[in-house]
Amino acid sequence: MPLRMIFMGTPEFSVPTLLALAGAGHEIAAVYTQPPRPGGRRGLDLQKSPVHQAAERLGIPVLTPANFKDAADRQTFRDFGADVAVVVAYGLLLPEEILSGTRYGCYNGHASLLPRWRGAAPIQRAIMAGDRETGMMVMKMDKGLDTGPVALAQSVPIDGMMRAGELHDRLMQVGAVLMTEAMARLESGELPLAPQAQEGVAYAAKISKEETRIDFSRPAAEVHNHIRGLSPFPGAWFELDIAGRRERVKVLASEMSEGEGDPGEVLDHTLGIACGEGAVRLTRLQRAGGKALAAADFLRGTPIAAGARIA
């Protein structure tokens, strides 16, 4: 028998899993997502989340509580009489009453190989740390932060040029397949659960605005990982004097290079930049309010001479 489930998610990352579960024939009684947020060019329009929009296209009822502090919201959740809740990047903490509010509990699709990178930003943190492998896991949620027992996992390699946006899109698809398999096994009573390892725990803290600035005093490999781990969003950046004023420039892609100089020194006409150790080459950049451009195109509109300093 197909499962009766509640789906909980918010960003684009969650949508393929919602679509896959619906396509597998499960009865999705309701979708929970974060409330509409101000958006549009002036921030005056309320914009529904990608999951909200997908659920409406599927004809599934959508609920958008700001939290579950209200007893009425917790009761509404239980009243759906669901077998299971599937959670993928929902963005809200779930109280115990919700975690135990369905027959089989809540199963989460998490974008790392736990216990490494528990928390809010596992995709970015894996690349920023220079990891060569990550993956998706389906786990049964408990009261801790991504500490529940693991049901299924699939690893995904990270090559030295992969950026966070590419890894996001890969894991988004892997996660949909993995969760669909997990729910099929849960339905048949054959879903295994194993406790997470006690060793290798790392936390993927939310990316702060302060750490997005590029620190060229770090070794080139770390600078390169920093850039690709934050691309395309929120974007690593440096400041540059343009037409007499200081302007922020995002770096969306880079590669390892050769050369020596003071950290932040422009080494050549192709944007080789000296780091604390070694050098990186900036290959895709974006000025505030402008389009993302290949380095050669960027330099045609914004010349940066060899010997200049960026920081």
Swiss-Prot record:
Name of the gene encoding the protein in the UniProt record: fmt
Lineage of producing organism: Bacteria, Pseudomonadati, Pseudomonadota, Alphaproteobacteria, Hyphomicrobiales
Any one cellular-component term (Gene Ontology): cytosol
Keyword field contains Protein biosynthesis: yes
Entries under HAMAP family matching the protein: Formyl_trans
Originating species: Rhizobium meliloti (strain 1021)
Function noted in UniProt: Attaches a formyl group to the free amino group of methionyl-tRNA(fMet). The formyl group appears to play a dual role in the initiator identity of N-formylmethionyl-tRNA by promoting its recognition by IF2 and preventing the misappropriation of this tRNA by the elongation apparatus.
Binding-site residues, (6S)-5,6,7,8-tetrahydrofolate: S112, L113, L114, P115
Annotated keywords: Protein biosynthesis, Transferase
Pfam families reported in the protein's UniProt record: Formyl_trans_C, Formyl_trans_N
Keyword Coiled coil: no
Annotated family: Belongs to the Fmt family.
Name of protein: Methionyl-tRNA formyltransferase
EC annotation from Swiss-Prot or TrEMBL: 2.1.2.9
